[in-house]
Amino acid sequence: RPERCGSAMRKAEAEKCARRNGRFNASKCRCTSAGKPSRNSEPSKGSKPRPEKPSKGSKPRPEKPSKGSKPKPEKPSKGSKPRPERCGSAMRKAEAEKCARRNGRFNASKCRCTSAGKPSRKSEPSKGSKPRPEKPSKESKPRPEKPSKGSKPRPEKPSKGSKPRPEGCGSAMR
């Protein structure tokens, strides 16, 4: 092939390749159509079915993601719109109080209570809150409870070390 493929041969092959809607590779002196190299011996038979199959196969691929991608952004948009509307100043206080009972953190901007890193579902506060304090207690041991053991170097030593600072300077000291 490289021996046969001179400048005149390349032009002729490139023109044939363009008719088949293919790409001509000058270095390999080959015409590739739809990512597959076309056989020069059977240009009429091989080139016709090849562009048709990719056209059929390529149509459902872009359509399916377009169908699947449409409901995905819509669902969060439906869920996210009512949250800021519901969450007024009174609502935030009530949610923050509920969240404090669960030993969770209340995010005012999102109007959500997160306990042990997981957002609590507002729809099931009574059912969902009972097992959650149990699980967070296990999960949160590394955070608030283990800090009692593991925080000896961090908050407890400061508590011992802080006695001379705020506690040492008490009413007796004054």
From Swiss-Prot:
Keywords: Repeat, Secreted. The keyword Cytoplasm does not apply. Changing residue 40 to K: In clone PCT21. Sequence repeats lie at residues 42-52, 53-63, 64-74, 75-85, 124-134, 135-145, 146-156, 157-167. Salivary gland. Its main location: secreted. Residues 28-174 are annotated as: Disordered. It is found in: Secreted. The keyword ATP-binding does not apply. Changing residue 86 to G: In clone PCT21. Changing residue 72 to R: In clone PCT21. Residues 42-85, 124-167 are annotated as: 4 X 11 AA tandem repeats. GO terms for cellular component: extracellular region. Residues 49-100, 121-159 have a biased composition (Basic and acidic residues). Used by the larvae to construct a supramolecular structure, the larval tube. This is Balbiani ring protein 1. It comes from Chironomus tentans (Midge). The gene is BR1.
